[in-house]
Amino acid sequence: MSDMHSLLIAAILGVVEGLTEFLPVSSTGHMIIVGHLLGFEGDTAKTFEVVIQLGSILAVVVMFWRRLFGLIGIHFGRPLQHEGESKGRLTLIHILLGMIPAVVLGLLFHDTIKSLFNPINVMYALVVGGLLLIAAECLKPKEPRAPGLDDMTYRQAFMIGCFQCLALWPGFSRSGATISGGMLMGVSRYAASEFSFLLAVPMMMGATALDLYKSWGFLTSGDIPMFAVGFITAFVVALIAIKTFLQLIKRISFIPFAIYRFIVAAAVYVVFF
């Protein structure tokens, strides 16, 4: 593979990763399809995907840095609160409660989960995840009990964490699972999305660090330019995608995302079967 060709592949996959990582559409499903069409598969490809995920995570850190610092007691200017009177504040405990279920299951069944990474499982996960998005829109309370992040209870945070366990199924979408779970628990669509992004930082950093540790041997110095291009591209695109997504969900429901998931599932079937 020539240098220019590999850099082009890195840029394309960086765009795909950045666009889909935090949208409820399954970045895994998209990466599998695009990677296959580009002929970029195997151990190096898997390590590359792990590295560019770090770029997407960095975008969340940049977007929510004040809130993240606030979780550990460091405030810049006026403390962040939902407009109007708040029942409390989002704390580090909320994040920890949201992490515990998936962390426990992920550590216990890490190898089993990795063995599920194949097109057929991803295809089914895309469909089921789409159905969950539709269910969340149809069954959510008419008036959210937690309109803002600072209105969330510990119970809601923990239940969102339980829904996050569904994302251990490759192709389900971590953001899709957590946002749907939040809406079903009475959290507003916007606040559930924000919480999903905040929860992604420790969850994805932990999972990425573990994957990178296990695949470190596949890295070579010659991969650095390609990995750097993918990382930077994923970061920039994810930053734009998150900002756009948070504006978009103020105006539309998640039904279009569910329909799109069904289309991607059909694409997986056409490409691989």
Swiss-Prot record:
Pfam families from the entry? BacA (PF02673)
Name the chemical reaction catalysed here: di-trans,octa-cis-undecaprenyl diphosphate + H2O = di-trans,octa-cis-undecaprenyl phosphate + phosphate + H(+)
Query: How does the record classify its membrane topology?
Result: Multi-pass membrane protein
Q: Which UniProt keywords apply?
A: Antibiotic resistance, Cell inner membrane, Cell membrane, Cell shape, Cell wall biogenesis/degradation, Hydrolase, Membrane, Peptidoglycan synthesis, Transmembrane, Transmembrane helix
Q: Which GO terms describe its biological process?
A: cell wall organization; peptidoglycan biosynthetic process; peptidoglycan metabolic process; regulation of cell shape; response to antibiotic
> Could you tell me which InterPro entries the record lists for this protein?
UppP
**Enzyme Commission code(s) on record:** 3.6.1.27
Q: Any other noteworthy remark?
A: Bacitracin is thought to be involved in the inhibition of peptidoglycan synthesis by sequestering undecaprenyl diphosphate, thereby reducing the pool of lipid carrier available.
* Name of the protein in its database record: Undecaprenyl-diphosphatase
What organism does the record attribute this protein to?
Escherichia coli (strain K12)
